[in-house]
């Protein structure tokens, strides 16, 4: 595990302990009962793929450790509606506060504002967090293989499945990919960002894509800024993408989403 992930795990463990003291598992389960059923994160992405379209997981992200504040004018419900209008298939919402200035209410309010399934984007270490995610309305959780053992990943995955949620398993190298493929989740995300150096390269996705069998849905993450980037990854059978920063920096998020998915020329021709 990188030094960055070790530091994150330290504060997450403290956060989880404090959360458990404040909100019991029974309370979380009661909150889950008041939520609408999971909307089908994987199903929404497969529908786009099967229709021959690019599938977009559009990210609602206020800030990041490497870039600092990304969007000062930050309105999660408005952003969710803008992404939906632009053709996104799903949302990804940051709930981690120390590193990303995220919050649980960003997830809840964004999901409530639209019909899209939503991913809780956070660093998951304990099954309690999975129950938090469902209580807040999440339809999917993220598992970062670089921060988890195989047993931990499987335990978190199975807990999410028991709640009707989907699981996005994130990898950055061949060893993590081999480990991810031992899990049963069909959603595999390739993070093009090195979490040790923050360097980003689409060649990471291009290199690892060939390891993945056809029964998994590959998602390209990080470093995707243009329709040309999407086309480049399509050449290695990646047609689903998680994109945040490049869209968050645009004034017209709906137009930027459409341009990413369909290309500037297609938008201009409408």
UniProtKB/Swiss-Prot annotation:
Q: Which SUPFAM superfamilies match?
A: Ribulose-phoshate binding barrel
Q: Which reaction does it catalyse?
A: 1-(2-carboxyphenylamino)-1-deoxy-D-ribulose 5-phosphate + H(+) = (1S,2R)-1-C-(indol-3-yl)glycerol 3-phosphate + CO2 + H2O
**Which is a Pfam family this sequence falls into?**
IGPS
Q: Tell me the superkingdom of the source.
A: Bacteria
Which GO terms fall under biological process for this protein?
Answer: L-tryptophan biosynthetic process
UniProt pathway annotation: Amino-acid biosynthesis; L-tryptophan biosynthesis; L-tryptophan from chorismate: step 4/5
| One Gene Ontology MF term | phosphoribosylanthranilate isomerase activity
Swiss-Prot/TrEMBL keywords: Amino-acid biosynthesis, Aromatic amino acid biosynthesis, Decarboxylase, Lyase, Tryptophan biosynthesis
Its family remark reads: Belongs to the TrpC family.
This protein's name? Indole-3-glycerol phosphate synthase
Organism for this UniProt entry: Rhizobium leguminosarum bv. trifolii (strain WSM2304)
